[in-house]
């Protein structure tokens, strides 16, 4: 009975190891594909599109209304 329990425990541990390593390898592979792909190299810095340095008068008026 102890032998069967030890085999079951080892099987569960190995299955967990395989399933977690599959997730890690797929994440690494998608990262490599993202870096080496055409779009991955062009869109390396996505934060530049989010920042707009110019603040218009309408934006300032809207912010003033929010702060009231």
Swiss-Prot record:
Superkingdom in the source lineage: Eukaryota
Gene Ontology annotations for the cellular component aspect, listed alphabetically: extracellular region; membrane; other organism cell membrane
Signal peptide: 1-23
Entry's family note: Belongs to the non-disulfide-bridged peptide (NDBP) superfamily. Short antimicrobial peptide (group 4) family.
Residues carrying Leucine amide: 36
Single biological process term from Gene Ontology: defense response to bacterium
Official protein name in the record: Antimicrobial peptide UyCT5
Primary localization class, coarse: secreted
UniProt keyword terms in alphabetical order: Amidation, Antibiotic, Antimicrobial, Cleavage on pair of basic residues, Cytolysis, Hemolysis, Membrane, Secreted, Signal, Target cell membrane, Target membrane, Transmembrane
Tissue expression summary: Expressed by the venom gland.
Subcellular location: Secreted; Target cell membrane
Job of this protein: Antimicrobial peptide that inhibits the growth of Gram-positive (S.aureus, MIC=1 uM) and Gram-negative bacteria (E.coli, MIC=15 uM and P.aeruginosa, MIC=2 uM). It also shows 37% of hemolysis when 15 uM are tested (93% at 50 uM).
Annotated propeptide span(s): 40-68
């Amino acid at each position: 009975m102890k032998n069967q329990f030890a085999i079951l425990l080892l099987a569960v541990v190995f299955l967990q190891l395989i399933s977690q390593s599959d997730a890690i390898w797929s994440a690494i592979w998608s990262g490599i594909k993202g870096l080496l792909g055409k779009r991955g190299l062009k869109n390396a810095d996505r934060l530049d599109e989010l920042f707009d340095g110019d603040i218009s008068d309408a934006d300032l008026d809207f912010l003033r209304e929010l702060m009231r």
